[in-house]
């Protein structure tokens, strides 16, 4: 990893055919429920030698069971991490669980869910960054 690469990546996940909007304005975003940190967007740290896009897709698959298409990166919101807008097929709509001890549930939210380790403002600002 070079100094220009992130330490972690996060995925702002929306559904195919659904506009990416501000929270509460029509679109929905995928969140995972961590046992200690509560609701958050999927993501994690890069493994040794891993490219940020590889880490993004690996974390998305591990934490949600989904694969998606990378639309764009925001490389400036967090000083040590990148946030990607990822689109997944529209058929995924109901809450579900995955075989990951760090994820209790996976769910679409059209408002910022109850958060513990994050702030409502973070998710509202990210929604503005990625909105159409």
Indicate where each model-derived feature is located.
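A short gly/proline-enriched turn/hairpin at secondary-structure junctions
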Residues: 40-44
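Residue-level signal for short, function-critical loop segments
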Residues: 35, 45
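Conserved N-terminal beta-strand and adjoining loop/helix that marks the start
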Residues: 1-29, 78
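A short, flexible beta-alpha/helix-coil linker loop
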Residues: 36-39, 114
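Unchanged
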Residues: 46-131
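Short, acidic/hydrophobic/Gly-rich beta-strand patch recurrent on exposed beta strands
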Residues: 31-33
């Amino acid at each position: 990893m070079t100094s220009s690469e992130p330490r972690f990546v996060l995925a702002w996940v929306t559904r195919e055919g659904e506009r990416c909007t501000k929270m509460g304005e029509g679109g929905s975003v995928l969140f995972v429920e961590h046992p200690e940190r509560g609701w958050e967007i999927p993501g994690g740290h890069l493994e040794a030698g891993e490219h940020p896009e590889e880490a993004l897709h690996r974390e998305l698959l591990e934490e949600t069971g989904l694969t998606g298409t990378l639309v764009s990166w925001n490389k400036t919101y967090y000083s040590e991490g990148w946030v990607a807008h990822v689109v997944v097929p529209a058929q995924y709509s109901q809450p579900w669980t995955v075989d990951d001890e760090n994820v209790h549930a996976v769910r679409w939210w059209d408002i910022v869910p109850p958060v513990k380790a994050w702030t409502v403002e973070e998710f509202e600002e990210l929604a503005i960054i990625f909105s159409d």
